[in-house]
Amino acid sequence: MNVAVERLDSEWVDSWCKRVSAALEPLMPSFLETHVFPPGENAVALATDESHGATGALVDLTPIPSDLTTLYWVISEISLPDIENGYFIHSPATVAEHFREYGAAEVDDESPGVVFASDGGGHLFAVATSGRVWRSTTAAWFDDFEGAAVSMQEFLEQISQRIADQS
């Protein structure tokens, strides 16, 4: 099903990064009080010249969805191992490496998706050219994918909500 969605805006992503970083700051010191182990490194890594170069190489390698390009213009990667069972948005260099090794993910009847993220349970997240985000049903690259969010923005908002729920 192709549903037209508004494309991701870099200013919105920048604002989202600031909100997430601010939400993580008070959460991590209290983590040890509610868990039997210390927190991992929960961080939003902003884009650098190096990650911009890796994004350019990824664009040359595959028809990368525009929302993923926008995302990588602002961030390099995100590591949230202590939010639920963990959420990880991979760096553009890692996405390119995985694309070379595994190719595109077949997601429903849409164009193939580019895997850009995973969770701590091994599930993969792929974005199709429509901007829709898909989640693998198992911890396998070539298994079925189901809809996770209608857009990259909704996917990021879901992560924000999970952080808020954990506070």
Where are these regions (language model features)?
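Conserved short hydrophobic patches within well-ordered secondary structure
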Residues: M1, V133, I159-R162
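A surface-exposed partner-binding patch
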Residues: M1-L124
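Short secondary-structure transition/capping segments
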Residues: G113-D119, S160-S167
